[in-house]
């Protein structure tokens, strides 16, 4: 942790996470005199994972850094900031409890919150709220963010992040419709899901499967070129398309004109 002399020259928030058996006990964000907004000696790599692991880490590809980081300490010259983090797990089960420990004082009037992207929850870490993650999975990273700064910035940043994340599953109307020769089918996922998108004819027979795989949370689109699973063009008429996950199923109608 920081030495006392360092505390007076900045601040850190240490984030730990565990399931009672496995955990990642030291990850830090913060600002420090002498640190920069790019990779420097205060930014440390995440240790390699074992067969069973809990890893809270940060990726900074915009810095040209390929490896994951366990600490991201930035310049004192900037007051507002967002630290995006990922929870990755392997061969372990949740729930996972998140705890924070602040070292040094934030600038007067500043606040720090933890944002859970999946649950759309905002936690003010000064209030010692219980933070529990229940929906982490091995297939995808679980995204959270630490947002620190003046209240107006923190509120706006959290709102902006959440506005990009769907609140519910949705299958949208294809476009164009009617179509020839191809159309786009879009859908929204509020969490990572194993997704199946299929086309059916008017008799309910499967024509082609467009997606049968995991997709991350967010907005997605897939194109149908009017062909069946053998690559043959299908005839003019009404067809149905479906989105199915473990938690959701919806069907909509489309029309192919030639």
Question: Over which residues does each language-model region extend?
Answer:
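Short beta-strand edge segments in extracellular beta-sheet folds
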Residues: 254-258
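Short, glycine-anchored, charge-dense loop/turn motifs used at functional sites
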Residues: 174-176, 180, 199-207, 239
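Extracellular and select intracellular beta-sandwich modules with Ser/Thr-enriched
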Residues: 248-252
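Solvent-exposed serine/threonine-rich low-complexity stretches and specific carbohydrate-binding patches
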Residues: 126-129, 208-215
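Compositionally biased Ser/Thr/Gly- and acidic/asparagine-rich
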Residues: 1-176, 184-187
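Short loop/turn microsegments at loop-to-beta-strand junctions
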Residues: 194-196, 222
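Beta-strand signatures of extracellular beta-sandwich domains
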Residues: 113-115, 196-200
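Short, surface-exposed loop/turn motifs with a glycine/proline- and acidic-biased composition
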Residues: 211-246
